[in-house]
Amino acid sequence: MSAFQPTIKRRESTKIYVGNVPIGGDAPIAVQSMTNTRTTDVEATVAQIKSLERVGADIVRVSVPTMDAAEAFKQIKQQVNVPLVADIHFDYRIALKVAEYGVDCLRINPGNIGREDRVRAVVDCARDKNIPIRIGVNAGSLEKDLQEKYGEPTPEALLESALRHVEILDRLNFDQFKVSVKASDVFLAVESYRLLAKAIKQPLHLGITEAGGARAGAVKSAVGLGMLLAEGIGDTLRISLAADPIEEIKVGFDILKSLRIRSRGINFIACPTCSRQEFDVIGTVNALEQRLEDIITPMDVSIIGCVVNGPGEALISDLGVTGGNKKSGYYLDGERQKERFDNEDIVNQLEAKIRAKVARQDPKNRII
């Protein structure tokens, strides 16, 4: 790891708990995703939640649009370990029902639940059962009067919408909540979060909504969330992709890993390759990413195909290889080793060295 580590001053916020996961304050930034199965298909939803948990999801959100879905949620909750957020709109009775079934957080907009007595019923229930709430403002569903006032979604419009909902909870003396102000436009989302970060002390849930497919969505999310996280804004995040939800978790951790905020698993440093490469760098990286998905312990591994940049990268990596003629140089903790790797068997040799280092360094294979 490079000795140059700029300090990111985290925004001060109150701490809440989603199940056993702390959000805000000095807690690690939590990574979450959302199921895209039919919630009433209990078997498929449970399977997807467990797959998300295996790749590191701290929290999983589940849409609960109907009472049938609420009954399914009860069965789902009993079969998984990761905290679950119920995504609820319009019908306050669904929120009350999933609260009975042990939901860990309610994602609602107080403004679309209906009359204040209904909002109060949800808040009172959340308070009694110690369930936090996420206020989720979205540029695509901004209130009609704010659309008319501002002409279009603007940072000020999203802020005003969020503060309206915050005011409702404040009036009901409820402070166990987090807030999001999502937009599909990067600059709109970033500026909205900046304004909100100055206006309230509650934890912020980050996201670029409807970001797009796997590649474009990951790029948009990395740009937008990267700007905010580098400024110390954000306490939990979701990468919204039109892709397998597992990719949302992987991209989320990749963003945090890139900013040295939170690491999970192997951070591969690999060259884009050119005619100087002495072994198949791309194939090596792809194979190792698949083989080492079970590794949680953070580790920097450099895989460079030649001696131009290879030694320099290896010096600041936990483990590294530098391409050579038929055999490649091997570095451990920044020091060149006498042992060399056979280029034809580099994947197997490198995997063995990585697993051996994990076993020595972190036998329990933990995340930080």
From Swiss-Prot:
Pathway, per Swiss-Prot/TrEMBL? Isoprenoid biosynthesis; isopentenyl diphosphate biosynthesis via DXP pathway; isopentenyl diphosphate from 1-deoxy-D-xylulose 5-phosphate: step 5/6
Give the matching Pfam families. GcpE
Q: What is its EC number?
A: 1.17.7.3
PANTHER family in alphabetical order: 4-HYDROXY-3-METHYLBUT-2-EN-1-YL DIPHOSPHATE SYNTHASE, 4-HYDROXY-3-METHYLBUT-2-EN-1-YL DIPHOSPHATE SYNTHASE (FERREDOXIN), CHLOROPLASTIC
Co-factor binding details: Binds 1 [4Fe-4S] cluster.
What name has this protein been given in UniProt?
Answer: 4-hydroxy-3-methylbut-2-en-1-yl diphosphate synthase (flavodoxin)
Catalytic activity as recorded in UniProt: (2E)-4-hydroxy-3-methylbut-2-enyl diphosphate + oxidized [flavodoxin] + H2O + 2 H(+) = 2-C-methyl-D-erythritol 2,4-cyclic diphosphate + reduced [flavodoxin]
Reply yes or no: does the keyword Oxidoreductase apply. yes
The broad enzyme category this protein falls into is oxidoreductase
Q: Which InterPro entries match?
A: Dihydropteroate_synth-like_sf, IspG_bac, IspG_bac-typ, NO2/SO3_Rdtase_4Fe4S_sf
Q: Give residues annotated as binding [4Fe-4S] cluster.
A: C271, C274, C306, E313
Its BP terms in the Gene Ontology are: isopentenyl diphosphate biosynthetic process, methylerythritol 4-phosphate pathway; terpenoid biosynthetic process
Membrane-spanning intervals of the chain: none
Superkingdom of the organism of origin: Bacteria
What family does the entry list?
Answer: Belongs to the IspG family.
Q: Which UniProt keywords apply?
A: 4Fe-4S, Iron, Iron-sulfur, Isoprene biosynthesis, Metal-binding, Oxidoreductase
Q: Which cofactors are reported in the record for this sequence?
A: [4Fe-4S] cluster
One function term, GO molecular function aspect: 4-hydroxy-3-methylbut-2-enyl-diphosphate synthase activity (flavodoxin)
Record carries keyword Secreted: no
Q: What does this protein do?
A: Converts 2C-methyl-D-erythritol 2,4-cyclodiphosphate (ME-2,4cPP) into 1-hydroxy-2-methyl-2-(E)-butenyl 4-diphosphate.
